[in-house]
Amino acid sequence: MLFRSQAYAQMRAAELMVREAAALYEAGRDCGAEANLAKLLAADASWAAADTCLQTHGGFGFAEEFDIERKFRETRLYRTAPISTNLILSYLAEHVLGLPRSY
């Protein structure tokens, strides 16, 4: 189980990458790798935080009154839309690491 402090650290890392990508974009520089990393980190941080929240609440996490189950479902969407984490990893492998195209 991911602890709340770990979820917080992941969210802060994602936020910092978002800021770096935005700064590069505003400066007119290429930010493809940073933007993709930001999306990947944010999606993973969101999923980890939702999982921790659900685990902390136990069975009550599935009760509709607490909205936890809805947030849990929504965080899954961030890993698939608008671009899946698998495609992000493929982009990073090809454009950052110089590996051959894998899809």
Where are these regions (language model features)?
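Alpha-helical interface subdomain recognition
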Residues: 3-103
